[in-house]
């Protein structure tokens, strides 16, 4: 991983020393975390490059920009060309390659193939290449869009600026630093309408698309985007192989992908969550030798079983497992600390998961200062059916028969979310109706895309989110001088998955069965077949979001004030007095959905303010260093025992009698307050008058109304005709908060 940036005067005006080189230097400084090992500037006529290097391959010889011996081509590469040795062999002796750097093959591939230069490359990369002879600049990205590359083209067409991060773009004085509220609201309200381009969040700034090249003429200033790769479609009439052959080929490609991504002259590690994705990556990587693994240990990962599974996977492979303790109630994150994370991530959809990933990278770097590469399990869910439970609802197991209703649910979800932009239904409409948001800042309706069959709908639905995940993973790692690598996004794997016959989809793409079957020889069955769980979702989600609310409320709502200031400075929709009231009401009537909505709006406003304030962020105070603990020892501590109790009650038995805790009752609150959801007006209230949780679901409200301290959970659900999954999350949260209790346990406790 490195940082690349530069600009070109498309009107032909030459760059000057003492001016433009200073701008290039500032752009490099803005992304210095991406490349702390070396800095290089290049000025040629009307083109300027700046390169920040993180040395991973060919430590001594890999300096960039890379030039051909005759000086015709200069290139900068952020990322890795994993198969560079094979490419070198294919080039034969036609060129004099002088280093062992993987990036050196790029200019010579251009000499051979011009716009086809990336076709032989297997890697993750963002490239800027200057051809002095043809007076041409190319900006290109890898097939999956793992490595970032953004650009700004001035309205008059005279200036093009590009960079790996927004921070570097904003260091150029001609690049606008204006938050794009319109595109943000499209993304916020309609996150999975397809197809769409991933927005940068700022006006006049776009991404070079994945698998594409921006071809810039230095003669006439013309800019043209061409695509060099697309996810292939299965050919009509192609032979259909048995399911086992696709599983076998998938396993072979994944093993080779991990092997390639161990290409490094510096130490590397792996983030081991405990799920099958990262467990498979860890097992395959361990074939090459020992490596450290890092795991989040929290109330959530204990409750989900992830922390224990990660410990067992590492122990079974003989690898060190660093369980890093995150205490949501005592993390100590300040507004400055949250600002630092937003500044690093550069986007508003940032929440608890990014917070913990950010600090897990921080811990890994502190624990192993020489570590520069982390392997991740990212990208598997989006391509192998890992998000079915979010799409169809939670259940214990999935069967091929569930495939039929997947397409219907996906299409109806996309249509409904698109319609929200026209009418702003439910609680989003409340924010407009009660004056929290200015309706004029919210865009009109959009129509969802369509896809011919179920798998394309699923893939399009979730690959939109993958773009964000890749952005998050790149930024949270880069902030600490670390490169993240994603074996599941090897283009050969994507091509295989895209061409599996439709008649095999239900068998292979339900709950990642193709991966689970491929993992059978690598992992114990209990790990390979572990049910998908989400990082900070489910019943533990409310703890994480209440932590986020405490950050927003810190220093008398410092971040709230900054968000309002950012909105006012940039013509945003936040109405100051109403927004402060909304913030206060959410504190009185807390719920995950309300806090999440508040957090995203605050993130938008803070980013708008940071950009308008020259995009700087003071270092501020960070949380105390993350603490590593031994899993078994921590589980014997009071905090561990508490987490274990919560874990044991994750799925309360049908014969449990649930009742209200002493002093807790249901009350009706008149609908219409800013913090009151449009749907629900019922609240659980403690006797001291504190509204502990808003009831946003009629199903949950009906369940609570039937609690009498005598009937069992199963009896109440049967009476109402409900499934346990429909109330599992709020029930778990209420039991954790102590507003509901197991009546029998409460009686035994009182007797004791």
Stretches found by the model and what they are:
Residues 376-379:
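Extended catalytic-interface subdomain
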Residues 1-4, 8, 116, 170, ...:
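Adenosyl-5′-phosphate
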């Amino acid at each position: 991983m490195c940082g690349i940036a530069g600009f070109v005067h498309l009107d032909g005006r030459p760059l000057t020393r003492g001016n433009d080189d200073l701008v290039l230097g500032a752009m490099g400084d803005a992304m210095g975390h991406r490349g702390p090992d070396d800095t290089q500037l290049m000025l040629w006529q009307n083109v300027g490059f700046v390169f920040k290097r993180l040395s991973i391959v060919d430590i001594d010889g890999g300096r960039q920009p890379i030039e051909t011996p005759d000086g015709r081509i200069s290139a900068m590469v952020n990322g890795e060309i994993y198969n560079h040795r094979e490419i070198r062999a294919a080039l034969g002796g036609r060129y004099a390659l002088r280093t062992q750097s993987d990036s050196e093959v790029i200019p010579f591939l251009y000499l051979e193939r011009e716009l086809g230069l990336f076709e032989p490359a297997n890697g993750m990369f963002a490239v800027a290449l200057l051809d002095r002879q043809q007076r041409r600049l190319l900006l290109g990205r890898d097939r999956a869009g793992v490595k970032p590359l953004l650009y700004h083209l001035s309205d008059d067409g005279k200036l093009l600026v590009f960079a790996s991060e927004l921070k570097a773009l904003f260091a150029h004085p001609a690049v606008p630093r204006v938050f794009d509220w319109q595109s943000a609201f499209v993304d916020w309200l309609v996150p999975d309408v397809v197809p769409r381009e991933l927005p940068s969040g700022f006006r006049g700034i776009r991404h070079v698309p994945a698998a594409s090249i921006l071809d810039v003429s230095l003669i006439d200033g013309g800019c043209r985007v061409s695509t060099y790769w697309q996810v292939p479609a299965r050919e009509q009439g192609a032979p259909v192989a048995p399911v086992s052959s696709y599983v076998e080929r998938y396993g072979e490609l994944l093993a080779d992908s991990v092997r390639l991504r161990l290409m490094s002259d510096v130490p590397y590690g792996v983030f081991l969550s405990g799920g099958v994705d990262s467990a498979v990556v860890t097992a395959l990587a361990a074939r090459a030798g020992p490596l450290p693994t890092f795991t989040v240990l929290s109330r959530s990962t204990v409750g989900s079983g992830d922390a224990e599974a990660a410990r067992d996977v590492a122990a079974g492979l003989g690898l060190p497992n660093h369980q890093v303790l995150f205490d949501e109630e005592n993390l100590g994150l300040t507004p400055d600390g949250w600002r630092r994370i937003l500044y690093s991530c550069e986007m508003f959809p940032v929440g608890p998961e990014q917070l913990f990933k950010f600090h897990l990278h921080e811990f890994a770097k502190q624990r192993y200062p020489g570590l520069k590469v982390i392997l991740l399990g990212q990208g598997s869910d989006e391509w192998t059916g890992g998000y079915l439970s979010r799409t169809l609802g939670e259940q214990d197991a999935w069967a091929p028969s569930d495939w039929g209703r997947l397409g219907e649910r996906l299409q109806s979800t996309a249509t409904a979310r698109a319609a929200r932009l026209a009418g702003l239904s439910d609680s989003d409409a409340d924010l407009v109706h009660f004056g929290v948001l200015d309706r004029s800042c919210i865009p009109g309706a959009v129509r969802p895309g369509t896809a011919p069959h179920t798998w394309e709908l699923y893939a399009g639905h979730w690959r939109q989110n993958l773009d964000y995940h890749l952005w998050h993973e790149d930024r949270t790692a880069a902030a600490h001088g670390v490169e993240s690598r994603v074996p599941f996004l090897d283009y050969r794997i994507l091509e295989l998955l895209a061409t599996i016959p439709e008649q095999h989809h239900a068998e292979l793409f339900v709950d990642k069965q193709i991966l689970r079957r491929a993992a059978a020889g690598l992992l114990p069955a209990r790990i390979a077949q572990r049910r998908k769980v989400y990082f900070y979702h489910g019943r533990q989600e409310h703890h994480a979001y209440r932590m986020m609310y405490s950050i927003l409320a810190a220093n008398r709502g410092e971040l709230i004030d900054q968000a309002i200031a950012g909105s006012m400075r940039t013509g945003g929709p936040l109405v100051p007095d109403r927004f402060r009231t909304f913030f206060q009401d959410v504190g009185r009537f807390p719920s995950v959905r309300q806090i999440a909505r508040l957090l995203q709006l605050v993130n938008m406003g803070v980013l708008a303010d940071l950009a308008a304030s020259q995009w700087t962020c003071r270092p501020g105070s960070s949380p105390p260093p993350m603490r590593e603990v031994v899993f078994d020892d921590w589980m014997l501590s009071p905090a561990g025992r508490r987490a274990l109790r919560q874990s044991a009650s994750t799925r309360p038995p049908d014969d449990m009698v649930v009742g209200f805790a002493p002093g807790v009752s249901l009350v009706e609150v008149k609908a219409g307050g800013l913090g009151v959801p449009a749907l629900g007006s019922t609240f659980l209230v403690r006797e001291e008058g504190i509204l502990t949780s808003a009831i946003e679901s009629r199903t949950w409200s009906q369940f609570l109304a039937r609690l009498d301290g005598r009937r069992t959970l199963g009896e109440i659900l049967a009476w109402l005709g409900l499934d346990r999954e429909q109330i599992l999350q709020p029930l778990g949260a209420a039991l954790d908060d102590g507003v509901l209790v197991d009546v029998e346990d409460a009686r035994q406790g009182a007797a004791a």
